[in-house]
C-alpha cells in the first residue's frame, strides 16, 4: 500500500501554519490589537451586484464560504479514495471505519454525561467527536520513519471517515429553518451537475458556475452551506473520454490553498479566545469539561477500544508492521480536534459567550495536550520498538 505523500506534505506543513495562526489569534485578542482584531471579524463584506448580493461579516464569509471550499476538497478526496484508493475495498476500510465510529460515540457520551441537564449546552455534543487531519498528520510526520506507513494510512483513512461523519452530523443536527424555494434551486443545480458529469464535461468553469449557485441556494435553504461543497465534489468526473482526471486536477490545485490558506485563516478568526478575567471555575464548567475529556479521553479510548474488539473478534488485523503500543499512540492523536471542533462549536453555539469561552478553551487545551502526549508517547515507544527489533536481529 502507498500513502499519498503529496497530501501528507500539504497537511503536515499546514499543521505548522495552523499553530502560527492560533498563536497570532490569541495574541491579537489578548494584546493591544484586541479592538483591531474584533473589528476585522465584524467587518461587513458585500459580494454581488444590484439586488443580487450577499452581505456578511468576515467571520461568516470564512466559516460559510472558505470552509465550503475545504469541504469540497474533502469531498473530492472521499470520491477518489472510494473509487480507487484506501476506501475502495471493504478490507481496507473496515478497521478505520470501526475506529472512527468509536471516536464519535464515546466523546459524545462523555459530553452528554457532563451536560445532559442543560438544553442549550447539550447542543455541543458533536464538538469533541471531530479530528483535525492537518494537526494529527503533522504530529505523526514529525516522527518520520519511526512510524510504519500503514499507521499513517490508518490515521489518514480514519480522518477521512471522521470528516464524513462530521458532514452527516452538520446536515442532520445543525440545520435551521428550511426554505422550499432554495431547495428547488439547489435541486436544479444538482441535476445540472449530474448532466455535466454524465457527459463527462471537463471544463472547470462550468462546474464552478453551477457550484456557486448551489452554494448560495444551500446557504439560503437553512442547511449549512459547507454541505454544498461536499455534494458538488461527488459530481466531479473521475476521468473524461481522453483519460484526463478533472477530479485529481482540482484536488491537486486546491490542496495547497486549503492547507496553507483556508484552514490557517479559519483558525485565526475562530481561535481568538479572550483570556481576560478567566477564572478556574469558568474553565471547569460542564461544557469545557465535556469538550476537554471528550476529546482527550473519549477519542483515544473510543477509537482504540472499538478497534481492539474488532481485531480480537477476527474481523481485521493491526496495520502492517505496527505494534499495539504504536497503534494506541496514533489513537491519542485523534484527540486533536482543533479546527474541526472549532467549526462545529461555531454551529452549535453561534459564537455565544454563554460559557465564558470555556468551549473554545476546552478545544484548544485538549487538542494541545493530545498532540504533546501523543508525540512523546510515540517517540518513546517507537524507539523501544526499534531497539527491540535490532536486538532480535542480532
From Swiss-Prot:
PANTHER family: NA(+)_H(+) ANTIPORTER NHAA, SODIUM ION/PROTON ANTIPORTER NHAA-RELATED. This is Na(+)/H(+) antiporter NhaA 2. It holds the Pfam family Na_H_antiport_1. GO terms for molecular function: sodium:proton antiporter activity. The chain crosses the membrane at residues 13-33, 58-78, 93-113, 124-144, 153-173, 176-196, 208-228, 260-280, 291-311, 327-347, 361-381. The gene is nhaA2. The keyword Membrane applies. It is found in: Cell inner membrane. HAMAP family: NhaA. It catalyses: Na(+)(in) + 2 H(+)(out) = Na(+)(out) + 2 H(+)(in). InterPro entries: Na/H_antiporter_dom_sf (IPR023171), NhaA (IPR004670). GO terms for cellular component: plasma membrane. Na(+)/H(+) antiporter that extrudes sodium in exchange for external protons.
Amino acid at each position: 500500500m502507498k500513502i499519498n505523500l503529496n497530501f501528507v506534505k500539504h497537511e503536515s506543513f499546514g499543521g505548522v501554519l495552523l499553530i502560527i495562526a492560533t498563536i497570532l489569534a490569541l495574541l491579537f485578542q489578548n494584546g493591544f490589537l484586541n479592538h483591531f482584531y474584533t473589528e476585522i471579524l465584524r467587518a461587513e463584506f458585500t459580494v454581488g451586484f444590484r439586488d443580487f448580493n450577499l452581505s456578511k461579516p468576515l467571520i461568516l464569509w470564512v466559516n460559510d464560504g472558505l470552509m465550503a471550499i475545504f469541504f469540497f476538497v474533502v469531498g473530492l478526496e472521499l470520491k477518489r479514495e472510494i473509487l480507487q484508493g484506501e476506501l475502495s475495498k471493504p478490507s481496507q476500510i473496515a478497521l478505520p471505519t470501526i475506529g472512527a465510529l468509536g471516536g464519535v460515540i464515546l466523546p459524545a457520551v462523555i459530553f452528554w454525561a457532563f451536560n445532559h441537564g442543560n438544553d442549550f449546552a447539550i447542543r455541543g455534543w458533536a464538538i469533541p467527536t471531530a479530528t483535525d487531519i492537518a494537526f494529527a498528520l503533522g504530529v505523526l510526520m514529525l516522527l518520520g520513519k519511526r512510524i510504519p506507513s500503514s499507521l499513517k494510512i490508518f490515521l489518514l483513512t480514519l480522518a477521512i471517515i471522521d470528516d464524513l461523519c462530521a458532514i452527516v452530523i452538520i446536515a442532520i443536527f445543525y440545520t435551521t429553518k428550511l426554505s422550499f424555494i432554495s431547495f428547488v434551486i439547489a435541486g436544479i443545480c444538482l441535476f445540472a451537475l449530474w448532466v455535466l458529469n454524465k457527459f463527462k464535461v471537463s471544463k472547470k468553469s462550468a462546474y464552478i458556475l453551477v457550484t456557486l449557485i448551489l452554494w448560495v441556494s444551500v446557504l439560503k435553504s437553512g442547511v449549512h452551506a459547507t454541505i454544498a461543497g461536499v455534494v458538488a465534489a461527488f459530481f466531479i468526473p473521475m476521468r473524461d473520454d481522453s483519460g484526463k482526471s478533472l477530479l485529481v486536477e482540482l484536488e491537486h490545485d486546491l490542496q495547497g490553498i486549503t492547507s496553507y490558506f483556508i484552514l490557517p485563516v479559519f483558525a485565526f478568526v475562530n481561535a481568538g479566545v479572550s483570556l481576560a478575567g478567566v477564572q478556574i471555575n469558568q474553565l471547569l464548567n460542564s461544557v469545557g469539561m465535556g469538550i476537554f475529556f471528550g476529546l482527550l479521553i473519549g477519542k483515544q479510548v473510543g477509537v482504540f477500544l472499538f478497534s481492539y474488539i474488532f481485531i480480537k473478534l477476527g474481523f481485521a488485523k493491526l496495520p502492517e508492521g505496527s505494534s499495539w503500543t504504536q497503534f494506541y499512540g496514533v489513537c491519542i492523536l485523534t484527540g486533536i480536534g482543533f479546527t474541526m471542533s472549532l467549526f462545529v462549536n461555531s454551529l452549535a453555539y453561534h459564537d455565544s459567550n454563554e460559557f465564558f469561552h470555556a468551549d473554545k478553551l476546552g478545544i484548544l487545551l485538549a487538542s494541545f495536550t493530545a498532540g504533546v502526549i501523543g508525540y512523546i508517547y510515540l517517540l518513546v515507544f517507537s524507539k523501544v520498538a526499534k531497539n527491540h527489533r535490532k536486538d532480535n536481529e542480532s
